[in-house]
Amino acid sequence: MSEIPAELKYTKTHEWVRQAGQGDLTVGITDQAQEMLGDIVYIELPEVGTTVRASVECMVIESVKAASDVYAPVEGEIIEVNTSLTDQPELINQKSYDDGWLFRLRPNNTADLDRLLDAKGYADMIAAEG
């Protein structure tokens, strides 16, 4: 069973969101997503300063199995990317909720977080997917 930390919010496309200081958000892919992808070998991070729209792809992760888009959970501006992943994309497989985070963004409207799933909602969605 995949790890689903209770303190995070989730998207239907398997991204997780952690609220950081000053209302900023840290974003990554869930344990479930990295398990489905398999060994991650390459990532294409978004550029700092880029404005992203909710539910629109903003970066790509490539694994030995497939390439997968990553979607922005809310609208906002990319303020930081995890450059460690450029040389160590396997951190996403090893520590998807910690060192494997993808980017940080400053949301345009923090109320957008209310439409994301909580841990139970995400677990129920995974169970329904089979």
Curated annotation (Swiss-Prot):
CDD domains registered for this protein in UniProt: GCS_H
Keywords for this protein: Lipoyl
Leader sequence segment: none
An example Gene Ontology CC term for this record: cytosol
Residues modified as N6-lipoyllysine: K65
Domain Lipoyl-binding stretches: 24-106
Database matches in PROSITE patterns: BIOTINYL_LIPOYL (PS50968)
Cofactor note: Binds 1 lipoyl cofactor covalently.
GO annotation (BP), single: glycine decarboxylation via glycine cleavage system
InterPro entries: Biotin_lipoyl, GCV_H, GCV_H/Fam206, GCV_H_sub, Single_hybrid_motif
Names of the cofactor(s): (R)-lipoate
Its job: The glycine cleavage system catalyzes the degradation of glycine. The H protein shuttles the methylamine group of glycine from the P protein to the T protein.
Family: Belongs to the GcvH family.
Assembly: The glycine cleavage system is composed of four proteins: P, T, L and H.
Protein name in the entry: Glycine cleavage system H protein
Organism: Nitrosococcus oceani (strain ATCC 19707 / BCRC 17464 / JCM 30415 / NCIMB 11848 / C-107)
Lineage, highest ranks first: Bacteria, Pseudomonadati, Pseudomonadota, Gammaproteobacteria, Chromatiales
